[in-house]
Amino acid sequence: MKNFKKLVLPALAMASALVFASCNQEDINTSRVGVTDEELNQGGLAYGLAMMSLQRSVMPIGVAGETGPGNSMQVLELISTGNYVGYYGNNNNWNFNTEGTWTFTNGRMSILYGLLYGDVAKSWLPIHIQASRAKDNLQAQQVLAMANIVKVVGWLRATDAFGHIVYTKAGSGDITPTPDSQQEVYKGMLADLEKSAAILREARESVLSRNDLVYNGDASKWVKLANSLMLRMAVRVHFKDAALAKEYIAKALDASNGGVIETTADEAKIGNSDKQPLAHPALISVDQYNETRMG
């Protein structure tokens, strides 16, 4: 019996140690009540909320009673560009201290930059990071393609307003990236639109339909939006780079590439829906602040 204990008990202890040592360290540190990245990727859970936030960041829009998007809309449109071109009139002149009267204060320009660039970046980056970890996951790359199109929609306004922005190094992890010239930004955007359209043309089913506030996951419409943006940008650069313009105009109008937006049924827009109840951001300034009117 003594010999049995001497031989068997140490063997059992060694076996237990080997079993414990062979445990996957990742499993040990994984919460039993949380979810893994793999589980988040199933059904697009990893991207859903970020995609909805990203789409809403291009033109600020929120739920009824939420004042944040209304305040942002004032800075972006109502008392700035929209006021200047005559789309809106205002009951408050803010001491003539707004862009509508050619007064560009540092404070307001900082807010504008944050809205046009920063808010888009905050929602795009999580999608970019998550999809970069799943390069072999077709759905992840399709979602990233959709996100990159939205990013271009948002950042196109940023570069048109401020010129140099960080684009080619965005999402690279570089904490001190050098802003790109507008020429490089446009080239990068055109390349991203072409790549995104190519990925989404191959989609055989809807992409993130539960969280897509624009097209409900219809990949063919996203392709048309990408090509339409490509066409718009290519026409803009015609006098600066005729060869680049010619190349991308041809690509955008090539029917085999998915076409462009030609009917209102294909226009990109976000509205109130069962998916996410929303209210027009201008209503805050019109009804609650009583500061803005049309024309």
Question: Where are the regions that the model predicts?
Answer:
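Structured, solvent-exposed acidic/aromatic patches
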Residues: N41-L45, N90-G295
